[in-house]
Structure formats: structure tokens, C-alpha cells
Amino acid sequence: ILMFAHNGSLNRGCEAIVRSSSKIIKDTIPNSYVELASWRPETDKIIKDVDNFIDASPREIKPSFIEKARMFLELKLNKSEEYAQTQIHKATVDKIDDVDVCLSIGGDNYCYGEEQWLYTIDKNVKKKGKKLVLWACSIGEEDMTAKKLEDLKTFDLILARESLTHDMLKSKGLNNVKLVADPAFTMVKE
């Protein structure tokens, strides 16, 4: 299982989702192997139920002339940054091949406007024939766009952590949505 779209555990909410989710997975699925693609993996080493940490920080790309031409044409003709975003997020995209399920755990990422990098990773997950789950999300009606809705339709399962998100996504015609408690509520006090 690969958890991705995580900006590191300096944010206590992000840490809580990773810590609680990895424990839920380990407790529920014997012999599971949990990997975390993080933009700040050095902040995540404190989480004991993660088996492997991947440095998924966006990388600077130095495209060749041909790659620059490809990116330019893709942007001009298709209005897409998919090739460039795939290269920038290569560490996460390459890891998809090694797993069965990908959990997008940045539950609030869909509240920050159009996130082309996220849509690109999601497309790569589906292109590679893997299961894609949006884990413990919270999305407001005001955040919805046609592009975002198209991306959400590609998910095999969307787990909303509150009823407003659940009901709004259902009202948009998404049938892949379930209401669940925020996994952070399962954390044991240390």
C-alpha cells in the first residue's frame, strides 16, 4: 500500500492521518507493507507502522530540447502539464508499479484550487491499473470545479471524513463515496 500526497509530519494533522492510517492498515491486514511518499520524509521517521519512506519531494527537472518541445506542445495543444508533472513527481509515479493500492492521504488537498500535480499522479495510478482511494477527505462545495470532479470520478473509492463532503460529492453524482470517521480519532494517547 502506498500512501501519497503527504507534505510531511511537521503538520500535526497530516502526521495524525499517517500515524492512525498506517496502524489501522497494519492491524487489519496481516503482513501488509505500507509505504509513505512524503515531501519531507525526515519528519515522518517517528511513525512506526510505516515500512518504507520515499522522498517524494517535487524534483527540479532539466528537460532536454525534445522534452521541452513535448511539454510546450502538450501545454499549447492539450492545455495539459501532465508530462512535466509526471517528471516532477517521478519518485511517487515510479513507486506505483510496486504496490497494489494507492491511498491519496492529503485529505484537504482538494480545497486548494486546481492541483494539476495531484490529478497527474491519480492518472498515473489508473494508467498502471492500480486501485486508487481518496482517504479521509474533506472538500467544500466552494472548492468543486469540473476538472476536480473529473478527477474524483477516477477513484475506486472516496472516503469522506464528514457528512458535508459525503453529501456534496453524492449530489455531484459520485457513487464511489462512503462516509467514515476521521482515522485520527483512533489514535491512542501517548
Region spans (language model):
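Aromatic- and Gly/Pro-rich donor/ligand-binding loops
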Residues: I1-E141, A184, E190
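A nucleotide-sugar donor-handling region in carbohydrate enzymes
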Residues: M144-E190
